[in-house]
């Protein structure tokens, strides 16, 4: 084999950025070069042939670490395959003439894949390609470029601009062109609620959430110059993306609550934060379930980086399984024990992953949970991590069917993390269904910056479950509060009876994770009638309390809930916590075109500046200030 080795000089801008990202994760130079240079192959084409040749050649050199072998031999093997392809192309030209003819490149509707119900999802692509039946120039045109990511070589201000800037042509953009911009994204409808009278509804109850998916989806729509879909904006998830100065406690969860004046209004704001106890990571049993169907072509690079981010956070002795699904599910490996040698195995096995076909996600879920159960760790972290755009076009694919499937899997005490990727055919409602009903959490990632903020920095907070079925309730004192409005949580609202019913499921909490809620309050004036709850029957005894916040939760392996409460008695200053949550709510309401949004742009800019000027909240959020500023400007 040749001594001509891949080097950093061989990497393009995107690959160099990826190389730096993998270095940050702690991988070796050869591993970083291999990971940065290789992109999951499509089922056809020269790149697929190169990978097959690479894997075959390495079998003769098994003692050489795969990444070292890849770095040292990729150039030569790739050149051999390309030379052979060029030779075949010239032979075809002599026999038949150019495939291009005078019409140029022509895209046409792909033939239906056998056993795939194409009536449910129309797929467009080029005709099947390989180096034996298509010219290299056409193949290059058809390759899906990885989605852009935001590297550390740029200033924070430039990164913030790039986060929301239209991306260059990639797979998602090509899909738009091929379908005349057809939009098949789907979201659950959100019905905004107004003020509730305390005398009519003295309690406000909701399922808590630590999800952040909505802000990832919002950023991706802006990045692709899409009109924002109001139902894609879940205010609670915008708030949860940011970090708050909330102390943990010895309890599994801790309640933080404060009331302050609402700017330019007679009303007050109630800020509620629930923080999970920070625990050391336990032994991990992780099953990575990757959607490798054709719709994931433009997400292949960020999916690979997310996978290797998870691997980098696993410790020696942890267990990893890798399952992919498209037309069918494929077990790449299972029960692999993590050690310094297994990283090379993982990288080599990654090259077997092929992006093609339809999406039978239900079969993949069945297989993933089977292996999670096979390697179940008592008192450990047992988790399925699903990466997908949610475009399930055969197998079980209705929301009701998926809910039934995942509720059954919930009984295994294996927890779920859903990582959404992509645009155009993104099925947010399906991913919400899986996460909400499967002891799961849900985030959306489309570039390296989001990956670092959501997975790398918050790994314990999305992987290590410390409580499940976590619900919150606020009971208001009618002597103090006339009416209230909960900002967000429209589709997570529950009744007072459901709050107390342990059979009513909710979402989990992970180590150090935070759930934030905000209420707008109209204050009471004069005497109120008795309606029979704590404050209504004991108004005089509780006259100094504005409300009581209650949280119910279950330990991961238990089915009986525990209850904690906190009374709120004092109106305080407009804290940085409250300012940050308030601005997030205002931005969300502006994107939703809410009739309740009344925060002037100049005040929003001021509060953003004040929140991040100094103090703990500024320190916790760092670069996120730039994103908040960019979002605030984008809705103008």
Indicate residue ranges for each PLM-predicted region:
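Short helix C-cap/helix-to-loop transition motifs enriched in small/turn-promoting residues
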Residues: 45, 62, 228-231, 247-252, ...
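Hydrophobic residues positioned within well-ordered beta-strands of beta-sheet architectures
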Residues: 206, 255, 270, 286, ...
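Low-complexity, Pro/Ser/Thr
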Residues: 1-2, 68, 72, 78, ...
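Acidic/polar low-complexity segments with low predicted structural confidence
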Residues: 143, 184-268
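Amphipathic alpha-helical segments in structured regions that serve as interaction surfaces
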Residues: 7-43, 47-58, 66-69, 73
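Long, acidic serine/threonine- and proline-rich intrinsically disordered regions
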Residues: 104-108, 122, 126, 135-146, ...
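Exposed acidic/Ser/Thr-rich ligand/metal-binding surfaces
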Residues: 104, 134, 152, 253-469, ...
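Polar, glycine-rich mid-to-C-terminal structural blocks
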Residues: 415, 441-446, 452-457, 463-510
């Amino acid at each position: 084999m040749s001594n001509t080795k891949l080097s950093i000089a061989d990497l393009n801008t995107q690959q160099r950025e990826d190389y730096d990202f993998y270095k940050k994760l702690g991988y070796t130079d050869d591993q970083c070069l291999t990971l940065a240079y290789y992109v999951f192959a499509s089922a056809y084409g020269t790149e697929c042939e190169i990978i097959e040749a690479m894997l075959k050649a390495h079998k003769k050199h098994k003692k050489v670490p795969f990444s070292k072998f890849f770095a040292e031999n990729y150039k030569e093997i790739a050149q051999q395959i390309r030379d052979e392809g060029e030779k075949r192309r010239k032979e075809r030209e002599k026999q038949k003439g150019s495939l291009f003819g005078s019409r140029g490149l022509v895209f046409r509707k792909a033939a239906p894949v056998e056993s795939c119900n194409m009536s449910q999802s129309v797929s467009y692509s080029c005709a099947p390609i390989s180096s034996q039946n298509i010219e290299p120039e056409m193949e290059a045109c058809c390759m899906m470029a990885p989605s852009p990511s935001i590297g550390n070589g740029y200033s924070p201000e430039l990164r913030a601009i790039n986060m929301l800037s239209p991306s260059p042509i990639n797979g998602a953009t090509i899909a738009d062109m091929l379908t005349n911009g057809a939009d098949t994204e789907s979201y659950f409808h959100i019905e905004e609620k107004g003020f509730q009278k305390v005398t009519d509804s003295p309690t406000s109850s909701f399922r808590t959430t630590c999800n952040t998916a909505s802000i990832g989806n919002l950023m991706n729509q802006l990045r692709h110059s899409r009109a924002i879909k109001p139902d894609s904006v879940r205010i609670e998830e915008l708030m949860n993306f940011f970090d708050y100065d909330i102390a943990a406690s010895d309890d599994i969860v801790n309640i933080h609550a404060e009331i302050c004046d609402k700017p330019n209004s007679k009303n007050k704001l109630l800020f509620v934060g629930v923080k999970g106890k920070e625990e050391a990571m336990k032994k991990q049993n992780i099953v990575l379930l990757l959607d490798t169907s054709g719709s994931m072509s433009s997400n292949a690079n960020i999916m690979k980086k997310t996978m290797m981010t998870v691997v980098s956070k696993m410790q020696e002795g942890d267990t990893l399984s890798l399952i992919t699904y498209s037309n069918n599910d494929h077990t790449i490996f299972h029960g692999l024990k993590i050690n310094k040698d297994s990283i090379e195995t993982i990288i080599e096995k990654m090259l077997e992953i092929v992006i093609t076909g339809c999406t039978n996600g239900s079969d993949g879920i069945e297989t993933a949970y089977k292996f999670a159960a096979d390697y179940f760790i008592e008192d450990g972290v047992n988790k399925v991590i699903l990466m997908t755009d949610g475009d399930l076009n055969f197998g079980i694919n209705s929301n009701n069917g998926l809910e039934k499937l995942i509720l059954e899997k919930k009984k295994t005490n294996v927890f779920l993390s859903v990582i959404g990727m992509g645009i155009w055919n993104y099925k947010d409602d399906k991913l919400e269904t899986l996460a909400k009903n499967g002891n799961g959490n849900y985030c959306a990632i489309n570039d390296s910056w989001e990956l670092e903020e959501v997975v790398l920095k918050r790994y314990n907070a999305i992987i290590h479950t410390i409580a499940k079925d976590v619900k919150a309730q606020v009971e208001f004192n009618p002597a103090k509060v006339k009416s209230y409005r909960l900002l967000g949580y429209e589709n997570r609202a529950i009744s007072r009876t459901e709050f107390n019913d342990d059979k009513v499921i909710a979402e989990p909490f992970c180590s150090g994770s935070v759930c934030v809620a905000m209420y707008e309050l109209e204050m009471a004036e004069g005497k109120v009638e008795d309606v029979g709850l704590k404050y209504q029957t004991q108004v005089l005894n509780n006259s100094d309390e504005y409300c009581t916040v209650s949280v119910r939760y279950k330990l991961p392996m238990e089915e009986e809930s525990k209850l904690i409460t906190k009374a709120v008695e004092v109106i305080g200053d407009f804290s940085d916590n409250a300012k940050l949550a308030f601005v997030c709510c205002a931005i969300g309401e502006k994107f939703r075109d809410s009739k309740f949004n009344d925060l002037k742009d100049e005040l929003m800019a001021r509060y953003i500046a004040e929140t991040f000027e100094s103090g703990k909240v500024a320190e916790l959020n760092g670069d996120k200030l730039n994103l908040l500023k960019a979002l605030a400007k984008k809705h103008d």
